Amino acid sequence: MINSAQYEFSCGVELESVDIQLDIERAYDLEYQFIMTSISHPRFNRDFTKASIGNSFSNKVAFTRSDTLLQSNYWRSSIVGKTSTNGIDLDSIDPTIRSNSVKTLKQEISWAAHLSLPSILLPTPSFNSTNYAQVVNQSLQSLSYMKVWIRIPLVSPKSQLLNKFDYYQDHNTSGGSGNNLVDNDNPWEWWNNFRLLCNQHPNLSAVLEMTSDLPSKEQLQQWLGEPVKCVIIPTSVFLTNKAGFPTLSKAHQQFLLQLFNYNIQFVVSGASMDTLKDYKTYLKFLHTNQNPLTQEEYFEMPYLDFLQAPLQPLMDNLESQTYEVFEKDPIKYKQYQNAVRLALLDLDKKDSKDDPIIIMVVGAGRGPLVNSSIQASIEANKFVKVFAVEKNPNAIVTLRNRIIMEGWEEIVTVIDSDMRDWNTEYRADIMVSELLGSFGDNELSPECLDGAQRYLKKDTGISIPTWYTSYIAPISSSKLFNEVTAYGDLKHSETPYVVKPHNFHQLAESKPLFTFSHPNRDEIIDNSRYESLEFELTIPSTTCHGFIGYFDCCLYKDVHISINPSNFSTGMFSWFPIYFPLKQPVYFSNGNLNNNNNNNIKAKCAFWRNVSKSKVWYEWCLLSPTITPIQNVGGRSYYIGL
């Protein structure tokens, strides 16, 4: 049985530590992995209102403990530092308070870096924390090891108070600048403003603080596209069961179960040492009792959020290990076998050993579709002759050996040729291919099949697949955006990537984009395409980092293979989605729109599929709520060679 969790459970405890050595030992005894505690000593006080806060920054009085209290490996692995919160205000209108706050934060960040702490937790920003962000951004430039965490509540204190007294609805409908009020009171907006001012630095992450009230489901899902590294769970959020032990509401449990699928640490806050173990035991129980990983999820784990360049099937030959991965798919070839069987049964032809049904497998690879076709003929009780057309000379070697091993010599003929160049007098009753990419047509299935369809019987020939459609949707994913940005050049920001997205939030349901049908009987075949699509977002505000692409393919009649979420072929893992990045993230907000019918965000994009004599490429852009430059103009950064 496959383990039930993708990631190990890591849980710490937040406390104000006077004796840090003793508290670490206690935490370990209670099976916590680390403690989260203030960098400055809890007995050290500063007066931020004084023009000079004297000994606070002098060498006469130490503001914290000595680094020699613990060995360096404990500082590096067992402690997350917290900066001061009492009295600190880096955006105060009082210049004295502001200046002293800046000095304090810089001093504590410097000390945390000196200790080699893995992470440092900073206080919650407000909607306008410009100076606070500037100080943090400066520090981020010099931190090579330590990560900076920003504490963000799921629901703002103001909203929690209003919910408690049941005034929230009146508060939102009492007139005035309602949209601005919602934005200013939305913790995601605080986080978004802060990280944008810090240029989305990859070492800056959010720490979510659970609240008794939870925001809407859409707003919770929004955090799945953000760089959340830790979740703090105050004991006040827990309920007590009949046995007197802590438990969480169903809504909190459901959100936690989602978070367990990410590499996130957890922290219990507000408990006394006497009750700490009960909270850890409960959270560990939830983590352990997840559903086991499916074979598909287990296979996908190493590829989560890992960017891969799409294949160039006509320019490059696939390697043996690539074929091997594709051939392990438990769903794809069963569906092909079903499609071929139905097609064989539908053919109005009397077959015999001397006059068999002709099946051409174009792009045969190492033979999985050949096998599916033969198995389908056995099920349909039909005599067939199979031509296996393949351009890769290395795959040809495997294919010829397989024919001998399987005893297919009387059934299968291997054609060592590009399907577009092969000449034969035979005409196929059925043409079978698996030339699809993550976006359907992005591995040149239309161009390949258009070149090969001259071998298909004109009036009665059947193509498998019959048609396929690409789908697209806007997404938010700081992770994917930062992965692309790390390359630091134009080429990578205009390249689509095959990826199994994990740390992302799809902002709307995907919509169909380009469709191709086979055989294509148009007198003049044109595989270039242009479409613009509009999406309606129900979330009040978000950041768009690009688009995620899928495909749905009809092999024959009602037999489909699909990676589109709405009709995904469960268990199939031959294809991951495709990610089209935007060069810069784009902020969406319903507060910026004047919709008459509702306040939902309307986002519109445009996509082009361009074709020349030597290459095929995509171009894309955003059209609303703001216009972005068209990317990959003329295929300057990425194309698929013909």
Swiss-Prot record:
The keyword Cytoplasm does not apply. It holds the Pfam family PRMT5. Residues 465-642 are annotated as: Beta barrel. It comes from Dictyostelium discoideum (Social amoeba). The active site is at 434 (proton donor/acceptor), 443 (proton donor/acceptor). This is Protein arginine N-methyltransferase 5. InterPro entries: Arg_MeTrfase, Arg_MeTrfase_PRMT5, PRMT5, PRMT5_C, PRMT5_TIM, SAM-dependent_MTases_sf. S-adenosyl-L-methionine binds at residues 323, 332-333, 390, 418-419. Disulfide bonds: none annotated. Methylates arginine residues in proteins such as small nuclear ribonucleoproteins or histone H2A/H4. It is an enzyme of class 2 (transferase). Its EC number is 2.1.1.320. Residues 1-286 are annotated as: TIM barrel. Keywords: Chromatin regulator, Methyltransferase, S-adenosyl-L-methionine, Transcription, Transcription regulation, Transferase. Gene3D superfamilies: Divalent-metal-dependent TIM barrel enzymes (3.20.20.150), Hnrnp arginine n-methyltransferase1 (2.70.160.11), Vaccinia Virus protein VP39 (3.40.50.150). Residues 477-493 are annotated as: Dimerization. It comes from the Eukaryota. The record marks 326 as: Critical for specifying symmetric addition of methyl groups. PROSITE patterns: SAM_MT_PRMT. Belongs to the class I-like SAM-binding methyltransferase superfamily. Protein arginine N-methyltransferase family. Residues 307-620 form the SAM-dependent MTase PRMT-type domain. One of its GO terms (molecular function) is histone arginine N-methyltransferase activity.
